[in-house]
Amino acid sequence: MANQGGFKKKTFGWVIKDLQTHRRCSVPILIGDSYWRLVALPNENGYFSLFLEVNMELIPCGWRRYVEFRMTIVNHISPIHSVDKKGWRWFDENTKNWGFKDMIPAVILNNVNVGFLLNGEITIIAEVEVHEFIDTLNASQVEELSDDSSEDLQNKDNVTIEVNGFQVLDSQVDQVNAIFEKHPDLISNFSLKNQHIRNAYMHALLDLTKTLSKSTKELTVEDMNEADNTITDLIKAGLNLDWLRQKFDQALEKQIAYDTRIGELEKQVKKRKLAVTELEADLEKEKAAASASLMLFD
């Protein structure tokens, strides 16, 4: 087994304010003897991609480091639904970056109801541990040091319960069970395996049902448009939501009818108020004329 010469570990945050740019890079951070940064591709083939990259221009020839890293996209509504992944890799002149092409679907990340987007920004937390080894490790020894680089981490700080392949909070279990009881074919075409992404889609569905349970007075046009987009995204992901789409379309049709009728009545009220104002003005004129006429007999 090789002797470990030491390691440097650092945790840092990155707030991305513009998700429309094709490529975004964080400020370089010094960890050990090298500078590291995060590189994001906001919409690479439908996914938000995230990578760790070392600045090869500032390191000596023959440099090689074993790096363990963990990346978290923070969910501001429910931390349990934060997307959290870890990986390991040897970085050298042939491998200067490594990460996750499918960190999270772009439609989920950009949905304001899901919780990753806050005031148009997303927050990423990176934990990077750079190891310096005196000798070179062989492949079997590296296996002893770390898990597979594609493994997802579970958030150990929160207790969750599995319901039909989804990790949900204890307070959400009854709601999720009720949905599956009424719609047992909900995930018959849902083939995503990544646990965190599956959880994110379920969270979006639960948030959607919460939004649609409000009275029409509480829902704005923006709420309805956002709900419409969310249903479309969830159906594209493979969830069988024809029943929800039908209910939503019916509710939207009624809402449009109500809004139209309310608009017509408001116009009539304005017209009648204007007519009353004109009548009041005529009344005052008549009173003034009558008063002037009576003064002729004084």
Curated annotation (Swiss-Prot):
Domain MATH intervals: 9-128
CDD domains found in the cross-reference section: MATH
UniProt-recorded name of the protein: MATH domain and coiled-coil domain-containing protein At3g58280
Gene source species: Arabidopsis thaliana (Mouse-ear cress)
Keywords: Coiled coil
SMART domains membership: MATH
Any Pfam family matching the protein: MATH_2
PANTHER family registered for this protein in UniProt: PHOSPHOLIPASE-LIKE PROTEIN (PEARLI 4) FAMILY PROTEIN, TRAF-LIKE SUPERFAMILY PROTEIN
Transmembrane spans: none
Coiled-coil regions listed: 240-288
InterPro entries: MATH-CC_domain_protein, MATH/TRAF_dom, TRAF-like
